């Protein structure tokens, strides 16, 4: 979880013991390139921590994919409306590489 720790500590001075508690609740996921991690219109309240890989968040407008942002190793990714408003959002997250991620539990 080296990349995730670096990503977190880039913004927050978190102790090793706090990180251990956080990681004890997380589930490891190894997913292939082109996997759709988050589907628009489907509620997904997870926060995904990226240890390895690269992904893109996008929405559909008139059938066209509009890229919103990219996430890389050490970043987090999630569907904003789903997480903040507990409503299915419009965002999709596609893995652009094979990825190793950690997610909060169901």
Indicate where each model-derived feature is located:
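Cytosolic regulatory regions built on CNB/CRP/Popeye-like sensor folds
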Residues: 1-106
């Amino acid at each position: 979880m080296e990349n995730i720790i670096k990503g977190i500590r880039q913004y927050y001075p978190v102790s090793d013991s706090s990180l251990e508690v956080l990681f004890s609740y997380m589930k490891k996921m190894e997913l292939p390139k082109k996997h759709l991690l988050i589907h628009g219109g489907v509620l997904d309240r997870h926060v995904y921590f990226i240890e390895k890989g690269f992904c893109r968040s996008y929405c559909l407008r008139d059938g066209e994919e509009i890229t919103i942002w990219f996430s890389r190793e050490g970043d987090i990714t999630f569907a904003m409306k789903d997480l903040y408003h507990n409503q299915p959002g419009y965002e999709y997250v596609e893995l652009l590489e094979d990825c190793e991620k950690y997610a909060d539990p169901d």
